[in-house]
Amino acid sequence: MYQQIARAIAARVEDGTYPPNRLIPSEADVCEEFGVSRRTARSAYALLVEQGWIVRSPGKGSYARGHP
C-alpha cells in the first residue's frame, strides 16, 4: 500500500500539484486521505525521499523536490 501512496504523491509532484520547494501534506493528512496508519504514511514518505521526490526537514515538514 505504501508504494501506491508514494506513486500517487510522486505523480502530484510531477504534475505540479505540489510545486518544487513547497510544503506537501503531512503524514497525518496522508493517513486521513488514504485511510492508512501512520506507519504506512511514514513508509511512503521514506520511499519518496529515497527516490528523490521529496526532502524532509525535521520540525518543519516535507517539501517537494521536483522530478528526480
Model features per residue range: what roles?
Residues 1-36, 42-55, 60, 66-68:
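Extreme N-terminal segment that seeds HTH/winged-HTH DNA-binding domains in transcriptional regulators
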